[in-house]
Structure formats: structure tokens, C-alpha cells
A protein has these predicted regions:
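Membrane interface segments of multi-pass transport proteins and intramembrane proteases
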Residues: 34-47, 115-125
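Contiguous, small/hydrophobic- and glycine-enriched helical/loop subdomains that border
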Residues: 39-66, 70-71
Length: 152
């Protein structure tokens, strides 16, 4: 029950269309709340992504093993890790950086440039989460560069 709740990010993974995007949008909503009401910075969101990755790997592994599917669509905790990792690259958090972070993470998560695709092949929950974490790193680098050049 706990593993399923965490893996599906409290039900977001059950979205009938685009559960990955639903997980990413939910991650942005929680990140916005953390930033606005708790003062969590973009770097803080990156640290939270790393902390979430540990139980996220476990939860993803439990759900994958119980379903018999290597990377079940309902598992979206990996999207949360990747989305928060992307936000770590923001030089400032404003509506433009939030939207750009969403677009960049989804781009790299779907495109899967090397080594994202290779990380996806790791066993169990590690492979489920690691590829999205790396997609998040790519997103963070591009988001940082865009901020550096005042593009948002």
C-alpha cells in the first residue's frame, strides 16, 4: 500500500491519459508550494529529488515486481524525481522557469539521449528512477544555461 501510493505519487499514475505528464505537473505543483510557503530554493528541490530517489527506487521496484511489468506506466515517482532535479537548475523561480522546466524535463524524458536510455536498462526500480533522474540533470543544465542568458 505504501509502495503503491509513493510509486503512483498518491494516485497521479492512474491518470487515464499521460500519467507521466500528470506526475510531472503534480511534481511542479508540490515544488511550487514548497518554494512559495516553505522557502525551498531550486537547489533545495534538487536535494529533495535525491532524497526522494531512495524510497522511490524501492517503491518502483515493489510495484514493478508485483505487476510483472518492467516499467509500469502507473509508476510516476520517477517523474517527480526528474522534474525536481530539472528545477534545481533554475537561476530564478518564476512562471517562465516553471513552464520551461516542465517542457525540458518532458523533452529529455521522452527523447532519452545517451546515457538516459542506457540507465533505463538497469534492473528494477533503479532503472525506472535513474533514467528520469538523468533526464532531469539534462533539463537542469539547459534550464541553468537559459537563465544564465536571461531567457526567462
Amino acid at each position: 500500500m505504501i509502495a503503491t501510493s509513493l510509486a503512483t505519487w498518491f494516485g497521479c499514475g492512474y491518470a487515464p491519459k499521460g500519467p507521466g505528464t500528470a506526475g510531472s505537473v503534480a511534481a511542479l505543483a508540490i515544488a511550487w508550494l514548497l518554494n512559495t510557503y516553505a522557502g525551498v530554493s531550486s537547489i533545495g528541490l534538487g536535494w529533495l529529488a535525491l532524497l526522494l530517489a531512495i524510497p522511490g527506487i524501492w517503491a518502483a521496484d515493489v510495484v514493478a515486481r508485483s505487476s510483472g511489468v518492467k516499467d509500469p506506466q502507473i509508476v510516476v515517482v520517477d517523474e517527480v524525481v526528474g522534474q525536481w532535479m530539472t528545477l534545481a537548475g533554475a537561476t530564478t523561480l518564476n512562471w517562465k522557469s516553471w513552464l520551461l522546466a516542465l517542457a525540458l524535463f518532458r523533452l529529455f524524458d521522452i527523447w532519452k539521449p545517451p546515457p538516459v536510455r542506457q540507465l533505463e536498462r538497469l534492473p528494477g526500480g533503479l532503472g525506472i528512477v535513474a533514467d528520469d533522474a538523468m533526464a532531469g540533470v539534462y533539463g537542469a543544465l539547459v534550464l541553468f544555461a537559459a537563465g544564465w542568458f536571461n531567457l526567462y
